[in-house]
Structures are given as C-alpha cells and as structure tokens.
C-alpha cells in the first residue's frame, strides 16, 4: 500500500518526521544547506517584502541550484536563469505573487513562466516558498499520484491537477488530525500541500533504499539458520519405511546367524 492511499494521519506524520534523515542520506554536496535555505530562510525573506513581495535574480539562481540539486541536473536551465536581468525577474515575481494572493494559481504560474528557463515546475517552487498551500512540482510527488492525474508531464494543466490533489490531501489530513485530537502529541503545524509533497519525497527515497536492500541476497537470520540446522522430524510415511528397512535388516541378520550355526555342527 502506498502512503497516498493510507487512512492514517499518524503514518503521514511519522513519514514527515523522517524528512531530515532521508535528505541527509543522499550525501549530495550542499543539498542539505540549499534545502535549509529554501524551506527555512527564503520564505521569511519574501514575507518581509510585503505588501509587494518579489524575488531577486540572485535568489532565483539559488532556487534553481536547489531544484536541480534535489532533482535532475539540467545545466541548460541554470544558464538561462543566469542570463535573466534583475528587473525582469523582479517584475515577473511581483506579478506572480499578486495573482497568487487573488487565488489564481494558473495566472500566478503563467506570470513566472514568461522568464526564460522557468517552466511550471520552477514556478511552483517560487510560489511554494511564499505560500505552502502551493506544492512544489517534484518528480517523486508526481509519480506518487500518476495513477490519478496521469503520467508525469511538466505542463501547466498537469501542475494545476497536481496542486488540486495535494491540497485536497492536506485538507483531509487536517480533518483527520482534528478528529483524532493528535495535536496533543506536540506537532501543532497544520498540513499543507507543500508538506504533503515533502512526505511523498521521503516515501520515494526511503522506499528506494528499502527496495535496494531487499533485492540483494540476504544472509540468513539467526532464527532461519537455527531452523535450517535443526534436524527434521520424520513424516509417518518416512517412519514406516525406516521401520520396514530395520526389520528387513534384522531378519537378514538372524538368517545369517542360523546358517552359520548350521555349518558349525559336527558331522554324524
């Protein structure tokens, strides 16, 4: 069963708790630092710029570096973003955040996609940094719900379907938490579409590690070894066969002894 079909909010919370561990397991140079910047440092910077938040050209480059490091490396995208001017990045992001505040995710995404090298996936990363109700269009999350929205595509319609599904899942998880009163456990953060996306990232990479181990030939466990070395208990049929063999051998032995005694008697 996949996490997406799980009916347990606690299972999702347990997966979320493993995010840092799984991220560190990749051992990609600077990934943890870049991820910390994207998730913890960058969002407050955007909010400080209210009421008209924007992204600088350098921040967009940094975000692209994070995106490519965490996913598939495509140097051409970095080249395009590096060639953008400060003014065009600022204006596009101003327009995007303005549309997002109005609740128009499509228009917000389109406003960023006018920039060369920025498609729906990169645009989603920019928007998610400002509003966690927008999920980053990560490959792992796309694959997790491919059975619902179709095979992975980096198009605007596909992103909108993706965002709708993850927002609905976040809403359901918050309802489950409220019903179970799980906030007493200490984690009082609400579920967001972005947090759901991060959980699916954990599932994909944690599961990949488990799968790679199970695909290798494992050494037998101590219990299995004891079971293997333990003498097997004969079946009833086997017992009967062994008894017949034993009786046959006994009869042959008695017959041989009678024959020997007969040869040893003195002649009349």
Predicted regions: what they are:
Residues 36-76:
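Small-residue-rich anion-binding loops in enzyme active sites
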Residues 1-44, 134-268:
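C-terminal accessory module of base-excision DNA glycosylases/AP lyases that mediates lesion recognition
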Residues 63-67, 126, 196-200:
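Short alpha-helical scaffolding segments that buttress acidic/His motifs in well-ordered protein cores
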Residues 107-148:
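Catalytic DNA-binding helix-loop module of base-excision-repair DNA glycosylases/AP lyases
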Residues 55-59, 89-92, 104-108, 118, ...:
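Alpha-helical interaction elements in eukaryotic regulators
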Residues 73-118:
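Helix-hairpin-helix/helix-loop-helix acidic hairpins
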Residues 48-59, 117, 182-194:
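Structural motif
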Residues 67-72, 130-134, 204-205:
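Short alpha-helix boundary/capping elements
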């Amino acid at each position: 069963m996949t996490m997406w079909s799980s009916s347990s909010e606690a299972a999702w919370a347990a997966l979320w708790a493993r995010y840092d561990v799984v991220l560190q397991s990749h051992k990609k140079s600077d990934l943890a630092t870049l991820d910390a910047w994207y998730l913890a440092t960058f969002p407050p910077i955007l909010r400080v710029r209210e009421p008209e938040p924007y992204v600088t050209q350098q921040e967009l480059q940094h975000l692209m570096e994070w995106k490519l490091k965490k996913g598939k490396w495509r140097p051409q995208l970095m080249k395009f973003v590096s060639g953008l001017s400060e003014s065009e990045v600022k204006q596009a992001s101003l327009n995007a955040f303005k549309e997002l505040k109005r609740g128009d995710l499509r228009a917000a995404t389109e406003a960023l996609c006018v920039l060369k090298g920025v498609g729906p996936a990169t645009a989603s990363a920019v928007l998610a940094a400002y509003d966690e109700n927008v999920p980053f269009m990560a490959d792992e999350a796309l694959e997790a719900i491919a059975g619902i929205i179709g095979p992975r595509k980096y198009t605007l319609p596909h992103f909108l379907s993706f965002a709708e599904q993850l927002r609905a899942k976040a809403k359901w998880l918050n309802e489950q938490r409220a019903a179970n009163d799980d906030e007493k456990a200490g984690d009082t953060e609400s579920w967001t579409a972005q947090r759901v996306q991060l959980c699916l990232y954990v599932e994909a990479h944690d599961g990949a590690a488990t799968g790679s181990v199970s695909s290798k030939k494992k050494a037998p466990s101590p219990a299995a070894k004891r079971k293997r070395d333990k003498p097997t208990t004969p079946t009833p049929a086997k017992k009967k066969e062994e008894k017949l063999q034993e009786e046959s051998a006994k009869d042959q032995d008695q017959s041989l002894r009678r024959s020997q005694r007969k040869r040893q008697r003195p002649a009349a």
